[in-house]
Amino acid sequence: MQEESLAASCLELPKDGTDWSMNILKSCKRIYTALLSLVLLLVWSAVAMAAAPDITADAAIVIDEATGQVLYEKNADKREYPASMTKMMTCLLGIQLMPPDAKVTISQAAASTEDLPLHIARGDVLTAEELMRGMMMVSDNGAAVAIAEHIDGSAAVFAERMNEKAQEIGMQSTHFANPNGLTDPNHYSTPHDMARLAQYAMKNPVFRDFVRQKERRVTWIAPSGKSLLAKNTNELLGRYE
């Protein structure tokens, strides 16, 4: 499952002390591949040729993840809905604030959220690690709500924490209204801010490990024996040398 990619980071906007026992990937190329799993991608060949890529996105940015240098931008400071890229912040805070073996119970609010590819149900119990890994691989909206509720009691209070963290890392044009990115007029960001968040998150070795996996069998504590094979929605994992 260890994949390689280009040494650059790409973001496009569409429609600590905890002991984590896991193998952490140290290859920089593989780190950059993991970052690509969080966003829609630009055409790398166009960037390599130093030609302006012909993209249909209303706003986009390409940065060098190591230095933050902007390699390409289009309306990079325009406010847009960040959609599921929001989950980068949710996952990052979850890693920082929850032990990996914390037991997270799925509430009715989480289970009734739209778009649940993990098929979580009210009363299900998973470890924080399993829930976050599953969320980042298949972008489960209910999992994000469950994480928020476990940390702060409600998604609304957790959104306040997200905004505090955003200000801390310099995301000056961002406001979060929920933990999963569902459309809300008060939920917005810019390509520049999302690039800043991704660059910050990728410095966390646990986060990098979460987003680099191509697939994983997510297991439940309850119901006992329940599991689901989650496949990463980033189709470019492993396609670049």
Residue ranges and their predicted role:
Residues T33-M85, P100-A102, A159:
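Beta-lactamase-like hydrolase cores
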Residues E114-V145, S227-E241:
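Conserved catalytic neighborhood of penicillin-recognizing serine enzymes
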Residues P53-A57, A155-E241:
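Penicillin-recognizing serine hydrolase domain
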Residues Q96-A109, P205-Q213:
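Short, well-structured active-site flanking segments
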Residues K74-E80, D115-R122, E130-G134, A144-G153, ...:
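Second-shell loop/turn segments in exported
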Residues T105-P117, D184, K214-W220:
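Acidic helix-start/capping segments at beta-turn-to-alpha-helix junctions
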Residues Y72-L93, K103-T105, L126-G134:
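Short active-site loop at a secondary-structure junction
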